[in-house]
Amino acid sequence: MSIHSVECNVGTNPITIETGKMARLADGAVVVRSGDTVVLVTVVSATKVKEGQTFFPLSVEYKEKAAAAGMFPGGYFKREGRPTEKEILTCRMTDRPLRPMFPKGYFYDTQVITLLLSADGENEPDILSINGASAACVVSDLPFAEPVGAVRVGRIDGQFVINPTNSQREHSQLDLVFAGTKDQVIMIEGSANELPEEDFIAALRVAQENVKVICEKQEELRAVCGKEKRAYELCLAKPELLEIGYEIAGDRIEEAIYAPSKVERQKKVGALRDEVEAAIKERHPEATDFDVEQVFEYIQKKAFRISIMEKDKRADGRALKQLRPLTAEVNVLPPVVHGSAMFARGETMSLCLATLAPMEERQYMDNYTGSVNEKRFILHYNFPPFSVGDTGRFGGQNRREIGHGALAERSIAPVVPGEQEFPYAIRVSSEIMESNGSTSMASVCAGTMSLLAAGVPLKRPVAGISVGLVTEQNDQHEITSYKTLLDIIGSEDFYGDMDFKLCGTSEGVTGYQLDLKLPGIPLSILEEAIHVAKAGRTDVLKVMNEAIAAPAQMSPNAPRIETTKIPADRIGELIGPGGKNIKAIQAESGADINIEEDGTVHIYAAKQEGLDRALELVTRMFKTIEIGELYTGKIVSTTTFGAFMEVLPGKDGLIHISELAEGRTAKTEDVVSVGDVVTAKCIGIDDKGRVKMSIRAALRDAKAAEAEAAGITE
């Protein structure tokens, strides 16, 4: 057994990458460790291409084992179940920087698996998964362009922190995951608390410096134990078929791909493709559908890129930095929906519905790694097939929908008010009505407006915009020229080189995600894209503010909530024996009450009257009975020597028979009965805390007040 390892001294804790000890039958396998968090990452690629394979079948799996945190899995079977949202997001985060590093046309089935073996609760395994996936490919015999490194950047007290621990992240204003090569960026994602663009760019530069260290260490590992690269074949368009394709479509493809609408464009492109297919199969009957598809896609992509680079011409006729027509509208649904909004950008449209609920509706998550295990703001993204004029599977969420929802959620979350200011659980559901690029950014805009329409006091509105990229490269795959595109449509995403999504307020950045089809771009290009996005975001915010600029009144159908605080050591008094007191308050007011361990009491009611009554009853329970004050309450029992009244919830006082009325009272029941509501004055509290009340004294005070008001003096 030959074991080799390298140590990357970056961030809070060094990252160790080791190979040769575990999973030695995989094409590549490494164990990555930071602190006491350990992951195993493997890669295996098939040696033959499956018949009919038309794309690069790269699958990335990430699994958190309960044993890694010294825990038992929940559920009846006590086994890990289907992937959690966090696992799916980590899969996507690991996949995106790897995919561009394989050669174009490499269609061999390839699988990367990351297993969390140990979790110390402080060092997040997602960064280890990305670094491990790259290292496993680097030491394997797979055709992998060059090492990819990844770091997380936080910003605490104005200082950038590399790979902050979970404890440090709680105080960070930035959560940036950066993946790249030694000198180029491939992928970023994360969130920030309205970070100015200049500071955001500074964070990217710091990340690039540290990623370089990790990439160099992977190269060291490859030098001592890397396998010789395997032989493989690439599935590319055949020259003889390309010649036929250009003969048929070369002069007509531009007219087809630059039709004004998506539907018309699809019709023209489809008709031209059929002509190309017929011509190819007539001359080469052995040609497959895939051969035809490769030829036609090559011609389309080439025409698209030439038009952008040489003519500054976009498919829908816009200038390179021009937005599509914008539409913003709130309250598009009846007020039974707490808040609704619709945002459209060209042929992309999102309808968002905001719902408010008691805090007990917040989402709780199984968490083995020590990161967030609950959240009160949730955004769900739904992409039905009709949004692209298609049929297909409906219901349930795929990885793409989960990823888009997470991006929109973390982009809006920084402006959502805290629990103390707005004690609600909040859910936004984004329903994509039409899709032609950047539906996640439309979800951010519509989601923001729906929250304002629901009365949520956001710090500031958030808007999102996408920036695309088209490049020209030399034989060494170096970028020689490029054009950035604002607000890209679907075809520009498909045929372009970049989809960079940036969200923020008028004050700064809140969320971002970069996806590339290239094996990296210089930071300077990304910095330019950030400034382009900022200008576009400003224009989008203007349109949104015209629709709604401030929180509206809450819907009458939204729950009413009040929060109060009681001493933590007196929670039992509010609950009462067997829940007697709290049940009585809820029954009388119609409200729901939730008590936290620190004594915070959340009161929820459908109507304001019930909320006010419940708050009054809770407040009264923790008031101190004072001598000389008047109190109104029910008679709870009678005796031969008097009656007991409920002075405050859970606190009774005795009205002696002599204090029930003026003159002599023969029998208590002659004056009061159980259930009567009376007003009495506290006339004393003995050393044992027993309260003495008097109806007679209350009546005397009332008569004296009436006489004084009438100007009568004795």
Curated annotation (Swiss-Prot):
Annotated ranges, domain S1 motif: 628-696
Boundaries of every KH domain copy: 559-618
Catalytic activity from the UniProt record: RNA(n+1) + phosphate = RNA(n) + a ribonucleoside 5'-diphosphate
NCBIfam families: polynuc_phos (TIGR03591), PRK11824.1 (NF008805)
Binding sites annotated in the UniProt record for Mg(2+): 493, 499
Subcellular location: Cytoplasm
Sorted UniProt keywords: Cytoplasm, Magnesium, Metal-binding, Nucleotidyltransferase, RNA-binding, Transferase
Biological function: Involved in mRNA degradation. Catalyzes the phosphorolysis of single-stranded polyribonucleotides processively in the 3'- to 5'-direction.
CDD domains, per database record: KH-I_PNPase (cd02393), RNase_PH_PNPase_1 (cd11363), RNase_PH_PNPase_2 (cd11364), S1_PNPase (cd04472)
Similarity section: Belongs to the polyribonucleotide nucleotidyltransferase family.
InterPro entries cross-referenced by the UniProt entry: ExoRNase_PH_dom1, ExoRNase_PH_dom2, ExoRNase_PH_dom2_sf, KH_dom, KH_dom_type_1, KH_dom_type_1_sf, NA-bd_OB-fold, PNPase
Enzyme Commission number: 2.7.7.8
Record-level Gene Ontology MF annotations: 3'-5'-RNA exonuclease activity; magnesium ion binding; polyribonucleotide nucleotidyltransferase activity; RNA binding
Biological processes, Gene Ontology terms: mRNA catabolic process; RNA processing
Major location (coarse): cytoplasm
Name the UniProt record assigns to this protein: Polyribonucleotide nucleotidyltransferase
Record organism: Akkermansia muciniphila (strain ATCC BAA-835 / DSM 22959 / JCM 33894 / BCRC 81048 / CCUG 64013 / CIP 107961 / Muc)
Top EC class for this record: transferase
Gene Ontology cellular-component terms listed: cytosol
Cofactor needs: Mg(2+)
One Pfam family this sequence matches: RNase_PH_C
